[in-house]
Structure formats: C-alpha cells, structure tokens
A protein has these predicted regions:
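Conserved ATP-binding/catalytic motifs of P-loop helicase motor domains
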Residues: 1-374
Length: 374
C-alpha cells in the first residue's frame, strides 16, 4: 500500500515537471485499493522521522491529497468468492464485527493435525517468514532424490531486497511450487500465484505442471527489469531506462508462503495459520485468499485476538460511509475537472518564468558587460 510520504513525493515530482501551482501537477489521480488489507510497511527508524509530519503512514494523511477535492467510491461486487455465506463471514472479519457466531462458523474448518493429500495442492499461509521457510525446507527434505540448484543471473544494478525470486532456487522432483509471473507466450500455461509441481529436473532443465493436471511442459527462465525513469531535457518527456536485470525460473517452493506474499493471490485450497497475527488486516487477507469455505482449513482455532484492526482506518472508513458521493457531486467534480483542463490552455506560467529568467540574465550579466546600455 502506498504510504503518505510516497504520495507526497509523487506530488513534488509532478509539480516540478508540470504545474507548480496545483496538487499532483494538475494530473487526474485514480487510486484503487483496500484499506482493510495489509497496512503500508514502515520501519521504526522511518516512522521516528515521519511522525513529525504525518499523523499516520496511510495514504490519506498525504499533505498533497488534503489540498485536493477527491471522491471515494466503494466497489461492492466480489469476484473471488461466489458463496454468499462465506462472503458474509469474510465481511464481518473485514469490518471488525466478528462475534462468537462468526468465529464458531469459521472454526468448523479447524482440523487438528491435518495432513493435506499431495495431489490436492494445499498451500499453507503463515504470519512469519521463518515459519514458511521451515515448512518448505522440511517438505523438500522429505522428498526422495537429488536436489538441484539454479542461480539467478543478475546484471547491472538490481538491489538484493527487490529480487522477485530466489537468488538460488533449490528444487527436487515432486516439489510443490508457485509461479511468480504470468506466462506471456501464446500458450498461457501459467499465471502469477498458480500452484504447480516439478515433474522432472536435471542440471539444465525443469519440467513442471499445474497441480491436478496431467500435462507437463518445459519451464524457461524469465527476466525482470529494474527500471529508472528520467526526464529527457530536449523533449520534456519521461523515458524508461533499465538499470539492471534479474533472470531466474519464475517459481518458488510453495508448500507454505507468508500471508504478506499471498496478498493479491487466489487459491483453491489453503491451510491458514493465523495464531500469531500481528498486523492490521492480516487475518482477513489470509482467509479471503481462498475461493470457498470448503477449501479452507484452519491449523489452529481462530481467536478474536488474531483479528487486528487499525482505528485510524476504521475512522476513515466511517467518514467515507457518511459522505457517500451522489450523482450531483460526481457531475460537479467532472465539470470542475474540465474547467481546469480549459484553464490550462490559457496558463502562461512557463512563459512568465522564462521572461523572469531573461530579466535576471540581463540584470546580472548583460549590463555588466555593456554598462553603456543602462
């Protein structure tokens, strides 16, 4: 999720290159997201500085955003789940309204010591990295056969903390994996978040398949770019420059992943371990990754303490509810935007600045060289 300081940095950049007088340089801004999911990441060392300028790290504390008139619209149709009963339970969790009845219904999915059938492709969602790593290491070690190691090819500048896949991928035949990218070929054989299995592997080749499928295919390495955006001084256009590349097979071991990494993904079957939830929205994100209630298994009973909500988000959401936009407000804002576009056609700010620079140059340089012009 975008932090307030990042949004203000976007504002500063747009003002610099477009229009200094208007928030975000006069650009129309569209932001899409869910505040009830995981909060923006802020280290303690960062917040010790940011707290002097912001009440909260959430985007709505942005100073630039507060200078604008914006409209908040709630999208209500859910596409991941079709079961209205499951949706009602998830919404109670999402809105921090989970009572004993909701918890009891969800805890029906608790299965002590559950051992998932290998062919069904269950994935375990954990709260911490070390938990997921332990599960994956244990499951990989339990497989027979030789482990194979594949090192990523990194060129140019590509910071280690932004690596999109393992620098050294270790797999065996039979390993459960998750794809990390969409297949851009015509075959469209895999997508980001799809669960699969390693069918065969040697020093130079990996054959994989989707879980539950009989059709396997040769997996090829994929390339990710580390991009930088620079301003072309001649054309005044922003151009994309690749600073570095990261090339690796687009998979990782996936008997378990963290809830944080699961955000945005959808699973047919998942085992949820939320007993150590520590962040706003964490439990909701974990539960809502699963398409059906039947595909969900709880590794431990769900407790109220694991459902953590941020009062700052709750207050913002209530304010949005109280000020739902109507058709008139939408129409008025559309008219105001078109008026701004029209006004920009008669904005001579850049000419005014050029004229001021000319006067300064005459005053500071020309008259010193040619004093008789005075």
């Amino acid at each position: 999720m975008v932090r307030a300081d990042l949004l203000d940095a976007v504002d500063a950049t747009l003002r610099r290159y477009r229009n200094r007088e208007k928030p975000f340089g006069g650009v129309q801004l569209l932001m899409i997201g869910d505040l009830q999911q995981l909060a923006p990441v802020v280290r303690d060392s960062e917040w010790s500085l940011l707290r002097n300028y912001y009440e909260t790290p959430y985007f709505f504390a942005s100073r630039a955003l507060r200078e604008t008139t914006y409209m908040t619209i709630e999208l209500e149709k859910v596409y991941r789940q079709n079961d209205t009963f499951f949706l009602s339970l998830l919404n109670k969790i999402r809105e921090n309204k989970a009572d004993d009845e909701v918890l009891n219904e969800l805890n029906r999915r608790y299965q002590q010591g559950f051992q998932p059938p290998k062919e069904e492709g269950y994935i375990r969602l954990t709260t911490h990295n070390n938990q997921a790593q332990q599960v994956n290491d244990r499951e990989l070690a339990s497989l027979p056969g030789k482990p194979y190691h594949f090192r990523a090819e990194v060129t140019g500048t590509f910071p280690e903390y932004t690596y999109p896949a393992d620098e050294i991928l270790t797999i065996k035949e039979g390993a459960q994996i998750m794809f990390l990218k969409n297949d851009v070929s015509l075959e469209k054989r895999y997508y980001n978040g799809m669960i699969g299995e390693v069918v065969a592997v040697n020093d130079s080749e990996i054959y994989v398949k989707e879980k539950g499928s009989e059709e396997d295919f040769l997996l090829l390495p994929e390339e990710w770019g580390n991009y930088k955006y620079v301003l072309n001084e001649e054309t005044k256009e922003i151009t994309e420059v690749i600073e570095g590349t990261f090339r690796q097979y687009p998979i990782r071991l996936a008997w378990a992943i963290t809830i944080h990494k699961s955000q945005g993904l959808t699973f047919e079957r998942a085992i949820i371990d939320a007993r150590n939830s520590f962040a706003h929205g964490q439990t909701y994100v974990a539960l809502s990754r699963c398409k059906t209630l039947e595909g969900l298994v709880l590794e431990s009973p769900l407790r109220k303490e694991a459902i953590i909500s941020d009062s700052v988000v709750d207050n913002f959401t209530k304010e949005v509810e109280r000020n739902k936009p109507g058709n008139k407000q939408l129409s008025d804002m559309q008219k105001a935007y078109f008026f701004d576009l029209l006004s920009d056609l008669f904005n001579f700010y850049s000419l005014e600045q050029a004229y001021k620079r000319l006067l300064r140059m005459l005053d500071e340089d020309l008259y010193k060289l040619y004093p008789k012009l005075l």
